[in-house]
Amino acid sequence: MSGELNGNDTSVQAAVSAGSVLEGAAFADEGEQHNESMKTLVLGALGVVYGDIGTSPIYAFREALHAAATNGILARSDILGVVSFIFWALTLVVTVKYVLFVLRADNNGEGGILSLMALVRGALKGRPDLILGVGICGAALFFGDAVITPAISVLSAMEGLEIVAPNLTPFVVPATVVILVTLFSVQKLGTGRVAIVFGPIMALWFVALGASGLWHIFDDPTVMAALNPYYAVRFLTVSPAVAFVTVGAVFLAMTGAEALYADLGHFGRKPIVRAWLWIVFPCLLLNYFGQAAFILSHGEAAALPFFQMIPSFALWPMVLLATAATVIASQAVITGAYSVARQAVQLNILPRLEIQHTSEKLHGQIYIPRVNLLLGLAVVILVLGFEKSSNLAAAYGIAVTGNMLVTTVLLYIVMTRIWNWRVSRALPIILGFLVIDMLFFSANIIKVHEGGWASIGIATVLVLIMWTWVRGTRHLFQKTRKAEVPLDLIVEQMAKRPPTIVPGTAVFLTGDPKSAPTALMHSLKHYKVLHENNVILTVVTASKPWVALADRARVSQYNERFMLVTLTFGYMQQPNIPRALGLCRRLGWKFDIMTTSFFLSRRSLKASVHSGMPLWQDKLFILLARTASDATEYFQIPTGRVVEIGTQVNI
């Protein structure tokens, strides 16, 4: 479905109608080609993809041990069980599920939950709303993750001050707020100039993780016995109730795994996989096993083991490096939130948002002021409300486990409908993933009262907003379509009663090229004039991320006065109507911006009891429509060439 471009409401009714064996399997059918060197891409992936999961050792092992302790006492079997569980969870969830399977499910090279949703909907007849609903839930959970990640990451790093200088403990929360406010304040300047150091800093961070862990493994080398899954299984079976609660905390070691897929379009599969197998996975394991060995030999150190196992002379540098790493992790999540928000707008899941480009060279570097403001406020409120990273842990797990569960469900459809796998082949794999996902999700969902309510609350509000927008735009489209007049009939009437012809070209934007655009009807009714050349323009968003320039425009001559033009953009592309119309020159229409006027409809919406939606949802939709960014700016049309015609619509 395509969309009419209006001033206050809908813009686009979107047409979404460890080692070589693993690596070899992951790269089967590999088709990516990169101009940059592999080393550069791997380094870049360290700075963007792995910031979140790379900072998990600061708090994940600590939280898991707290959950596993019985009356504050940890047995040796508990410590080995927890670290064994972390090892096998990272192996099965990240290395097997994401590296071997999910990264293959790209949508023309792009990843992320909305890309996966668009891919699945495009493969199913009728583009079922159930898949749209699943995608909306996944996107809402991602935004919930984007709120929690900066809060828990930076807060956990600043808690290192409690070890370095206990007298600075009261300043942990204020310092965290200052760092986060600064981070969100500088977003409008762009990250291009500083992003170049993200990779090297994160590389140094992973080296520090691995080195500190390796050093302390020698405190108790027997910790390596935890590589045996026996310890994980024994931990789960000896005390199931305690183990079940601990599973929720263990999942914190997996947070950030979804970034492997979300950032697929930025780096490609090969650099992401190589960074994981060669650097990230080994360094994470060394650190987790090092923390376990340190606690086995220093039982009293379970409070903040990550910082407590650092030598005193290296504490300050480690706190500073941890702070830098968590800021980078937060930056990656913020950038991801911008990207998902843009996709949601293009897929007509959210209203139009003002999108600013912060780099002339890199089109993907964008800044969305409204998303930045709401995200920043939510993050600061979480920090002030929860005060400690341990209090945020419960909220964190629900968002990420929910997102992973959605990914698994959509992956099954990709396997059976796109890869054409037999159900007998796909189902056992998916069931295995679902068992793991459900185990983690159920272990986290029981923590609603401990802070999980924050994650659920954020996701619920966002689902409500997105579904209201989808439902409202559909009702509006159907209602206005009933009142529209077929273009054939208007042309026939004009042939009988010709209006006054004025020079120039008029472009009328519409969601249905078979109907006369509202702006055209008002122009004929009130001014009784028709331009010499008239273009009925439809903008369509494809279910793939990128549309080649050769496929951007379709032009057909309706009659001597009217021309039909369809512009198609991918959901990762920012529509630029004047530039796209310039491509029509090679199709026979000599577009000249200086002699062209763009006619847009600006609708004033009013709630109605007959809309088909509850009155409260009508009012919410109207509020969302009023806050949508201006169509002229969104589609990058010169303001001096735009004529807006207002209409009132009861929905």
Curated annotation (Swiss-Prot):
Keywords annotated in UniProt: Cell inner membrane, Cell membrane, Ion transport, Membrane, Potassium, Potassium transport, Symport, Transmembrane, Transmembrane helix, Transport
GO cellular component: plasma membrane
Disulfide cysteine pairs (residue numbers): none
Reaction(s) catalysed by this chain's protein: K(+)(in) + H(+)(in) = K(+)(out) + H(+)(out)
UniProt xrefs under InterPro entries: K+_transporter (IPR003855), K_trans_C (IPR053952), K_trans_N (IPR053951), Kup (IPR023051)
Coiled-coil annotated spans: none
Lineage: superkingdom: Bacteria
The protein, known as: Probable potassium transport system protein Kup
Chain ranges passing through the membrane: 41-61, 82-102, 130-150, 163-183, 194-214, 235-255, 276-296, 309-329, 366-386, 395-415, 426-446, 450-470
GO MF annotation: an example: symporter activity
Membrane topology: Multi-pass membrane protein
Record's function text: Transport of potassium into the cell. Likely operates as a K(+):H(+) symporter.
Major subcellular site: membrane
Subcellular location: Cell inner membrane
The family this protein is said to belong to: Belongs to the HAK/KUP transporter (TC 2.A.72) family.
Native source organism of the sequence: Brucella ovis (strain ATCC 25840 / 63/290 / NCTC 10512)
A matching Pfam family: K_trans
